[in-house]
Amino acid sequence: MNNEQFMTLALKEASTSQNDLPIGAVLVCDNRVIAAASNQKERTSNPLNHAEKIVIEEGLKKIGDFRGKNIKLYVTLEPCPMCAAAIILSRINEVYFGAYDLLYGAFGSKINMSRIMNSKIKIQGGILENECSKILTNYFKQLREEEYGKPERTS
């Protein structure tokens, strides 16, 4: 599979997020998916349950080593500082993300955790960026409509 195909799987995970921010992540080892998840902060009432953190915990447990070897992470939104630190400490080799996060992005948009933590991790953003951005835009649009109602059309 290629980067776009793995990101498509992450998008599918994001679409299962129910009332959570629709972010999906897929952890890949030797070109095989070893973990997939969406955000679960609202579902679990735990603000730390980001999709990235969940797949790292599940995936590294499956391979039996907390140091990722030949592991790639695909996530629909640029990781936040907490997730970026977890990625680096887990020694994940490559990170591919879809949409850039101009508020909290920790791999270049706002800050660069890989430089701060002296990591040699490979990072590439913008994989299926439009699709990843659209799912987030639609989520926030729906939230606004639920809060304030649909905007009235004027002729």
Question: What kind of feature is each model-predicted range?
Answer:
Residues M1-D20, M82-S155:
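Zinc-dependent deaminase
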Residues N19-I23, K69:
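Short, basic and Ser/Thr-rich N-terminal targeting/leader segments
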Residues I23-N31:
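Short beta-strand scaffold segments in enzyme catalytic cores
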Residues A25, I63-D65, M113-R115:
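Short secondary-structure boundary/capping segments
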Residues I34-K41, K120:
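Short beta->alpha transition motifs characteristic of CBS
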Residues R43-N46:
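Conserved Nudix-box catalytic region and its N-terminal flanking loop in Nudix hydrolases
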Residues L48-N49, K53-I88:
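Helix-adjacent hinge/juxtasegments
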